[in-house]
Amino acid sequence: MLSLSYAAAGELAPRGIRVNNVAPGWVDGGFTHQALAASDNPERLRERASALHPLGRMALPTDVANAVIWLLSNQAAFITGSMLLVDGGFMIQHNS
C-alpha cells in the first residue's frame, strides 16, 4: 500500500492532488474488539496491547479520524507522499 501511495502521490501532485498514508497502531475498536472477544483473557490482552505503546494506550478511532481530517485540511496543504504514524509511539519502541 505504501509503494502504491508513493507512486500515486508522484503522479497526481502536478494536478494538485495530495496522496498520503495514515498508519495506525492498535485501535480500540473493530478488529481489536474481535480479538478481545475471542481471547481467553480479554483484560490481559488489552493491558498487553496498551503496554506496547509508549503513550500507554491503544488509539481511539477518533485519534485516527483526527489525523485524516488534519491531512485533508489546508494546514497540511504542502504534504504529499507521506506516511503519518498514528501509533502512540509504537514504532519508536519496536523499530529495531
Language-model segments: which ranges?
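Conserved catalytic Lys-bearing alpha helix of Rossmann-like short-chain dehydrogenase/reductases
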Residues: 1-5, 19
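Short-chain dehydrogenase/reductase
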Residues: 5-6, 65-68, 72
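Alpha-helical segment proximal to the catalytic Tyr-Lys
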Residues: 10-14, 77
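Rossmann-like NAD(H)/NADP(H) cofactor-binding core
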Residues: 15, 20, 82
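Short, flexible catalytic-loop segment of classical short-chain dehydrogenase/reductase
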Residues: 24-34, 86
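A short C-terminal helix-loop "cap" of Rossmann-like NAD(P)-dependent dehydrogenase/epimerase domains
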Residues: 37-53
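A conserved structural motif in NAD(P)-dependent oxidoreductases
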Residues: 53-64, 75
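Short C-terminal tail/terminal secondary-structure segment
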Residues: 69, 80-96
